[in-house]
C-alpha cells in the first residue's frame, strides 16, 4: 500500500524533522539503497552531543551513518544565537533560526537521522564553566539532556567535549560535563520522575565517550573518517565538510577538502558493560555490544520471549537476501525481499507488544524497511498547493510553463492541492489510497478523475484535492519555543498547534 500524506511534523522538546528537505543525490538510487541496506543490518545507534551548531564532528557522523549503517542522532544544546553572522544583519533569536536551518542542511550530509535541541540559549562567549551553569542551571540542562536520551534511546553516547578547560567555551564545557552525568541519570527512573509520569521510560545507554583526545594521550577508540567512500565519491570527512560549508552564517561557505587519514581519538569514560567485554583499546564504539538484529533482546538486556528468535531470524534472512540481490543497475531487485522483511517486522511488532523496548527498535526497523523500499523503487511524490480550479498546461511548451502562483491563504479559504506519485522500479505497485492529512478543522475532498491503481513503471499518478482552512486557523505560524525577555537564558516551550 502506498499512502501519501501531507501534514506537520511533531516537535518533541527539540526534535527537528530532517525529512522536510529534498534528498541528496547520494541518498537516492543505487547509492541511497545500499546505505539503507546497511542500516537494516544493524541495531547500532549513537547520540553525538555538542553545544552549538558547527561544533559537531561531522566526519565521524558521516562515517557512522553512511559507512557502518548505525543510527545517528545529534543533540545540540543551543542554536548559536550569540554567534557572528557573516551573511546579514540578523542576530540573537533571528540568527538562532538561521543557524538551526543551516545545521539541518548540514545534517543531511552527515547522515543524521534525528536532530535535537534543548531549551537553553546561547547567551554569549564565556570561558568559564561556572558562568554557564549559573546562567542555565545545571539541573535544567541535565533534565533536558536526560529527556532527549530517553526519547531517542541510543546504545552509545559520544560527547564532542570533555567537560573541562580544554573545551574552551563555557557552553562547550557544560555539554561535556552534562553528557557524562546524563549517561547514568537517564537510566535511573528516580531522576526526573515527572518524565516517567509523562510516558517516557528510563533508558540506560551502554557506553559513553568523550572527544578531543590526542594521539599521545589515554584514548580508547581511533576513528578515521578520511576513508574513501565509493558511494559518496569522496571521503566521509570531505562529504561532511561539504555539509559544514552550508553553515554559511559562520564560515561564509568556505570549503577545504583534504585527502588522507583524518584520525579522531575518543576516550571511554563510563560503561555498564562488564569489564570482560571491553578493553583499554577498542576497534569501534560497539566493541562488547552485539548489534545484530537477532541479538535484540540480549543487547536490550531483556528476557527473550518464546518464539522471538525465529521472528528475528526471519527478518534478518530477508535483509541478507535483499543485500545479496542488490544490483547497481536495478536496485529494485532487492524489493521483494525487503517487502518480506517489512511484513515480518510488522508481525514481530504485534507479537512483542508487551516488550516496549524491543517494539521501539522494531518500529524503527519498520521505518527503515519502508525507506529502503521507496528508495530502491525510485518512488517520487510531490504535493503542490495552487489556486482552486488551476488547469494543467498543455502543448509542446507545457514542460516550460511557470508554476501556478499561490499567495498566502486566510482562514476559511479554499485552495487546491495537486499530488503526483510515480514508482520507477521494476516490481509493480498497487496504489490503495492517496490521501491528505490536514489540520484540525480543515476539510479535504478529492477532485478530478481517478487514475490507474496499478501504474506502470515511471507512470505518473495524480490526484487533486480541494482543501478548506478552518475558520479559526491561525493567521501565521510560530516557533514552539519563546522567551519573554532578551535576558532570559532558556526558552519556554509553547503549544504551536
At which residue positions do the language-model features occur?
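Short acidic, glycine-rich surface-loop motifs adjacent to enzyme active sites
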Residues: 152-165
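Eukaryote-biased detector of low-complexity, proline/serine/threonine-rich segments
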Residues: 454-497
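Short acidic, flexible loop segments centered on an aromatic residue
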Residues: 424-441
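Short, solvent-exposed loop/linker segments at the N-terminal edge
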Residues: 390-394, 399, 404-413
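The feature marks non-catalytic terminal segments
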Residues: 22, 32, 185-388
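Bacterial N-terminal signal peptides
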Residues: 6-19
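Short beta-strand elements of extracellular/lumenal beta-sandwich folds
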Residues: 407, 411-426
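Active-site rim/loop-helix segments in enzyme catalytic domains that contact anionic ligands
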Residues: 20-151, 173, 177-184, 188
Amino acid at each position: 500500500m502506498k499512502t501519501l500524506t501531507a501534514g506537520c511534523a511533531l516537535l518533541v522538546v527539540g526534535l527537528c524533522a530532517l525529512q522536510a528537505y529534498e534528498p541528496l543525490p547520494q541518498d537516492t538510487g543505487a547509492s541511497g539503497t545500499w546505505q539503507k541496506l546497511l542500516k537494516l543490518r544493524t541495531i547500532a545507534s549513537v547520540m553525538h552531543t555538542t553545544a552549538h551548531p558547527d561544533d559537531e564532528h561531522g566526519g565521524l557522523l558521516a562515517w557512522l551513518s553512511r559507512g557502518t549503517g548505525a543510527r545517528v542522532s545529534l543533540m545540540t544544546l543551543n542554536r548559536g544565537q550569540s554567534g557572528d553572522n557573516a551573511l546579514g544583519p540578523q542576530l540573537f533569536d533571528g540568527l538562532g533560526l538561521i543557524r538551526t536551518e543551516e545545521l539541518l542542511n548540514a545534517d543531511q550530509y552527515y547522515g543524521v537521522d534525528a536532530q535535537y535541541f534543548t531549551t537553553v540559549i546561547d547567551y554569549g562567549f564565556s570561558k568559564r564553566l561556572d558562568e554557564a551553569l549559573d546562567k542555565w542551571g545545571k539541573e535544567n540542562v541535565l533534565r533536558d539532556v536526560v529527556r532527549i536520551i530517553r526519547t531517542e534511546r541510543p546504545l552509545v553516547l559520544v560527547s564532542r567535549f570533555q567537560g573541562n578547560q580544554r573545551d574552551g567555551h563555557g557552553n562547550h564545557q557544560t555539554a561535556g560535563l552534562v553528557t557524562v552525568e546524563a549517561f547514568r541519570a537517564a537510566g535511573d527512573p528516580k531522576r526526573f520522575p515527572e518524565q516517567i509520569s509523562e510516558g517516557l521510560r528510563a533508558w540506560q545507554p551502554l557506553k559513553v565517550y568523550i572527544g578531543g583526545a590526542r594521539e599521545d594521550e589515554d584514548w580508547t577508540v581511533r576513528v578515521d573518517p578520511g576513508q574513501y567512500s565509493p558511494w559518496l565519491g569522496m571521503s566521509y570527512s570531505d562529504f561532511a565538510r561539504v555539509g559544514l560549508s552550508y553553515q554559511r552564517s559562520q564560515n561564509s561557505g568556505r570549503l577545504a577538502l583534504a585527502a588522507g587519514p583524518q584520525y579522531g581519538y575518543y576516550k571511554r569514560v563510563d560503561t555498564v558493560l562488564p569489564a570482560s567485554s571491553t578493553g583499554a583499546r577498542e576497534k569501534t564504539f560497539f566493541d562488547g555490544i552485539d548489534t545484530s538484529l537477532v541479538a535484540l533482546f540480549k543487547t536490550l538486556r531483556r528476557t527473550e520471549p518464546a518464539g522471538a528468535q525465529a521472528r528475528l531470524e526471519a527478518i534478518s534472512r530477508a535483509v541478507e537476501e535483499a543485500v545479496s540481490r542488490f544490483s547497481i543497475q536495478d536496485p529494485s531487485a532487492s524489493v521483494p525481499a525487503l517487502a518480506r522483511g517489512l511484513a515480518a517486522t510488522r508481525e514481530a511488532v504485534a507479537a512483542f507488544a508487551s516488550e516496549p523496548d524491543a517494539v521501539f527498535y522494531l518500529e524503527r526497523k519498520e521505518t527503515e524497511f519502508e525507506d529502503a523500499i521507496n528508495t530502491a523503487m525510485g518512488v517520487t511524490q510531490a504535493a503542490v498547493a495552487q489556486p482552486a480550479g488551476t488547469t494543467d498546461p498543455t502543448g509542446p511548451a507545457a514542460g516550460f510553463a511557470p508554476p501556478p502562483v499561490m499567495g498566502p491563504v486566510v482562514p476559511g479559504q479554499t485552495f487546491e492541492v495537486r499530488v503526483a506519485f510515480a514508482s520507477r522500479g521494476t516490481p509493480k505497485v498497487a496504489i490503495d489510497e492517496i490521501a491528505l492529512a490536514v489540520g484540525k478543522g480543515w476539510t479535504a475532498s478529492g477532485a478530478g478523475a481517478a487514475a490507474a491503481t496499478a501504474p506502470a513503471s515511471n507512470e505518473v499518478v495524480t490526484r487533486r484535492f480541494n482543501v478548506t482552512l478552518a475558520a479559526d486557523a491561525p493567521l501565521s505560524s510560530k516557533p514552539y519555543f519563546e522567551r519573554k525577555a532578551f535576558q532570559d537564558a532558556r526558552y519556554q516551550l509553547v503549544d504551536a498547534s
